[in-house]
From Swiss-Prot:
This is Cerebellar degeneration-related protein 2. The keyword Coiled coil applies. Residues 38-142, 178-268, 348-376 form a coiled coil. It comes from the Eukaryota.
Amino acid sequence: MLADSLVEEFEIREDEPWYDQQDLQQDLHLAAELGKTLLDRNTELEESLQQMYATNQEQLQEIEYLTKQVELLRQMNDQHAKVYEQLDVTARELEDTNQKLVAESRASQQKILSLTETIENLQTHVDDLQRQVEELKKSGRGRMNHERSDQPRSMHSFSCLKELYDLRQYFVYDHVFAEKITSMDSQLNPLEEENENLKKAVTVLQAQLTLEKEKRVTMEEEYSLVVKENCDLEQRLVDIDLYRARAEELEVEVAEMRQMLQSENTIHSAEKLVPESFFISFKESLERELGQSPADDGLLTVPELDKKALKRSSSENFLSSAAGGDILRGHEETCIRRAEAVKQRGISVLNEVDAQYNALKVKYEELLKKCQIDEDSLKHKAVQTLKQYSKDSVGNTQYDLSANNQEFTNAGELLSSTNTLPEYKALFKEIFSCIKKTKEEIDEHRSKYKSLSSQP
């Protein structure tokens, strides 16, 4: 456009007459230089424009790249948000599990406390029973064993009490640890640190769970063993009570027999019994008289008996009398003599029975002491098995308990055999049967004598 304007000016100036040729050349030269400079400037502007286009495209590419990076960052942020949500969920679950574990630890601690209380109650019960056994042992020994010193009752404690208290301490520590875990800061740490902390917490909790399960299993095994041993001890104590009741029954029977003997002795001394041999001889003489006179239908009078002879119990001489008065006087004299003999004989029988009773009583006390010694030894063995109990020697303790049970059953069989066949009982039975027979025979002879004497 500048060149066209210059050409027009040049044409106008040619028309004018005052236009100089030199000036025209100079103007042309200047115009050429100006056009050249303008062309250079135009090329520079075009190059700068192209550079601007290139930079613009580069910036557009950078913008696209940055938008892609922003999208990737948004995706990463979303993923991180999801991970944070999952971590929050896992943290809540872990807190819930921690609370459950704390509750379970408290429940197990309460259970252990209740078990310790029951064990202590059982221990006190066993101690009371041991005291009763020792008191019975002391009362049973009596005057025979004053020289022997009573063995002091050893206080036996269960070996598992220490482990129970240790477990209580461990459970308290677990409870504190769980409270520390639940009271952790809720601030969001970096992902790696949080993951590592959570993994460590999970491993610690799993280890504590395994330890608690193992301790619970061991405690249940120990509790079952203690329950079995306590059941065995209670059964033995029941057997001891049965033996004691049996012994009291035997003592009551002996006292009743003694009272019966005393009552029989008082009755015999009051009635002044005639010896059995006299009445037997009198019975034989009466039967002989009745056999010789069958035509009279067994009716005899006292004068008819005056002609017969009576046999004495002390000798085999015959007594002949002529009158009924002589017979009666002789009969009274013999009754008096026989009453004195019966008194002496009853005293001697009582002395013999008393001696036999004392011997049987001594024998019975010895058997009772022997049974009590066996029971005490079994009781001490059973309690020592509790003290010597350990996890590695469960089989040995069971073997000892079975051996103790066998010894206890043997002792019970021995005591039952002694209770089923007592010798003094048979002796007293024979004595009472003899006394009853003699009494019946005496009553029969007396009734016959009264019937004969009452006849006219």
